[in-house]
Amino acid sequence: MSDTKPCVCLDGSCSCENTCRCSDCRCPTSKAGRCQKSCCSCCPAGCTNCANGCVCKGKASDKCSCCS
């Protein structure tokens, strides 16, 4: 059983739990199936939330951009 839980879309907004990947968080109402800004919370483990997405701790070159 995986620790990763799926993202749930409610009222056009994405709700992410634990370390679900942003690629799994696709709301039907969002353009081209992309994650909405409310999905910034679905960062991979070791990442911190930023205004324009998620940036990994440690390696500056390793970005986890959830909201690009």
Curated annotation (Swiss-Prot):
Binding-site residues for a divalent metal cation 3, renumbered to this chain: C16, C20, C25, C35
Binding locations of a divalent metal cation 7: C56, C64, C66, C67
Q: Which InterPro entries match?
A: Metalthion_dom_sf (IPR017854), Metalthion_dom_sf_vert (IPR023587), Metalthion_vert (IPR000006)
Family, according to the entry, reads as follows: Belongs to the metallothionein superfamily. Type 1 family.
Read off the Pfam families from this record.
Metallothio (PF00131)
Report which gene this protein is encoded by.
Answer: mt
Organism in which the protein naturally occurs: Scyliorhinus torazame (Cloudy catshark)
Detail which positions bind a divalent metal cation 1: C7, C9, C22, C25
GO MF annotation list: metal ion binding
Ligand binding (a divalent metal cation 4): C39, C40, C50, C54
User: What is the recorded function of this protein according to its Swiss-Prot or TrEMBL entry?
Assistant: Metallothioneins have a high content of cysteine residues that bind various heavy metals.
Q: Can you say what this protein is called? A: Metallothionein
Q: Where a divalent metal cation 6 is bound, by residue? A: C43, C47, C50, C67
Entry keyword set: Metal-binding, Metal-thiolate cluster
Please tell me where a divalent metal cation 5 binds in this chain.
C40, C42, C43, C56
Domain of life, per lineage: Eukaryota
Q: What is known of its domains?
A: Class I metallothioneins contain 2 metal-binding domains: four divalent ions are chelated within cluster A of the alpha domain and are coordinated via cysteinyl thiolate bridges to 11 cysteine ligands. Cluster B, the corresponding region within the beta domain, can ligate three divalent ions to 9 cysteines.
Q: Which residues bind a divalent metal cation 2?
A: C9, C14, C16, C27
